[in-house]
Amino acid sequence: MLNDLDQWVAGQWETFPLTNPYSSDDSARHAKKRTNLKEGYLVRYADDFKILCKDGKTAQKWYHAVRLYLKDRLKLDISPEKSQIVNLRKRESEFLGFTIRANKKRKKRVARTGIKPDKKRKIKEEARKLIRRIRSSPSALNALRFNSFVLGIHYYFKRATKVNLEFSRLAYDLRAFIYNHLRPVGKYGRPANPPPTYKKLYHSSFKTFQIAGVYLFPLADVKTVNTMGFSPEMTPFTKKAGIKYTKSCARISNGKLVS
C-alpha cells in the first residue's frame, strides 16, 4: 500500500516529467528548481517515513499534501503528535533509532547523526543483563552472546557520524559495572594473542575481559562508516549480480560468533 505513496512522492519532484529533455540529472534538477514544484525526498522504512525539504515553506506544502493523499487515496489518518515539521537547523529529529540534525560547517549544512537517547538506555540495559549472565555462568557461550550483541549494535549504528563519541560514552558509563562484575571470573587486559576474527574487527589496544578463553568485544571500539546508496546490482536474482550479493553477505556474516 505504501508503495503507492513512494511513487506519488517521487512523481511530485524526482521523477516529474519535464517538457524538454536534459543531458544530465543535475541539469534537470536545476530546471525543476526554477518551477513551483515541491522539492522533497522521501526516506521510508515500513510505515515510518520522512520527507526532506529545503525550507519551512516547502515543508508546509508537503505536510498538507501528504495528509490529504493518505486520507483520500489510502484512507489513512496521520497522528498530529507523531507527524510534525522539524527544523533540523535548530533541533534534532529521530528516525529508526538515530538522531538527525543539520549542523553548520563553513558555508554549508551537513548531517550530524547520533543515537536516540531511549535507544542508548536500552543498550545499557541489555549490556548489563548479558554481563550479569556471564557473572553467574562464565562460559564461552555467554561471552559469545555478549560479543554478538556488541557486534550487532556496532554494525547498525556505525552509520552515525557521532558513533565513536556515543559508544565511548556508553563504555564509560558501563565501565565500573563491567569491571566489578567480571573481575572475579575473567582476566582483564589488552588481548595478547587474539583470534583472527577479533583482529579483523577490533584493535588490540583496548583493554577487555577474557572469559573462558573468549575476548569480549570492546564497546568503545567503533568508527563511522559512510553509508552508500543501494546498488541495483546487489540482488541475488541474476548470475553476475548474485555473485556480488553472495560475497557481500559472506563478508557481513563471516565469523560473527567466532572469537
Task: Explain the meaning of each model-derived region.
Residues 1-259:
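Non-catalytic terminal/accessory segments
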